Amino acid sequence: MLNKKEQRLRRSRQTRARIALQGVERLTVFRTNLHIYASVISADGGKVLASASTAEKEVRAQLGVAGKGACVDAAQLIGKRIAERAKAAGVEKVAFDRSGFAYHGRVKALAEAAREAGLQF
């Protein structure tokens, strides 16, 4: 029987296999207890085109002293930043790769903020 982490990794492998068949760039999300990370990866999977995370110095300063990287507000900020950076890199349409995490809470907030900022998926 698989533990919780192994189940998540299995789901993420299945998702990435489906996205690879589509042949589009993917917006991948990784979530920890402290931070959230987002990257836009090329269609062949070999190159990171844009990235953003709550571990960045500018983001931590913007969130303030009380602002933690592990909140919905921080995820929304990262969603907007990744959309801006992806558009600057010439990427308009992506496939959303939630890395096996549930589409809920911070992952959902990041996705919705990226959509509002103009990224299509």
Swiss-Prot record:
<dbReference type="GO" id="GO:0008097">
    <property type="term" value="F:5S rRNA binding"/>
</dbReference>
<dbReference type="Pfam" id="PF00861">
    <property type="entry name" value="Ribosomal_L18p"/>
</dbReference>
<dbReference type="GO" id="GO:0006412">
    <property type="term" value="P:translation"/>
</dbReference>
<keyword id="KW-0689">Ribosomal protein</keyword>
<dbReference type="InterPro" id="IPR004389">
    <property type="entry name" value="Ribosomal_uL18_bac-type"/>
</dbReference>
<comment type="subunit">
    <text>Part of the 50S ribosomal subunit; part of the 5S rRNA/L5/L18/L25 subcomplex. Contacts the 5S and 23S rRNAs.</text>
</comment>
<dbReference type="GO" id="GO:0022625">
    <property type="term" value="C:cytosolic large ribosomal subunit"/>
</dbReference>
<protein>
    <recommendedName>
        <fullName>Large ribosomal subunit protein uL18</fullName>
    </recommendedName>
</protein>
<dbReference type="GO" id="GO:0003735">
    <property type="term" value="F:structural constituent of ribosome"/>
</dbReference>
<comment type="similarity">
    <text>Belongs to the universal ribosomal protein uL18 family.</text>
</comment>
<keyword id="KW-0694">RNA-binding</keyword>
<keyword id="KW-0699">rRNA-binding</keyword>
<comment type="function">
    <text>This is one of the proteins that bind and probably mediate the attachment of the 5S RNA into the large ribosomal subunit, where it forms part of the central protuberance.</text>
</comment>
<dbReference type="InterPro" id="IPR005484">
    <property type="entry name" value="Ribosomal_uL18_bac/euk"/>
</dbReference>
<keyword id="KW-0687">Ribonucleoprotein</keyword>
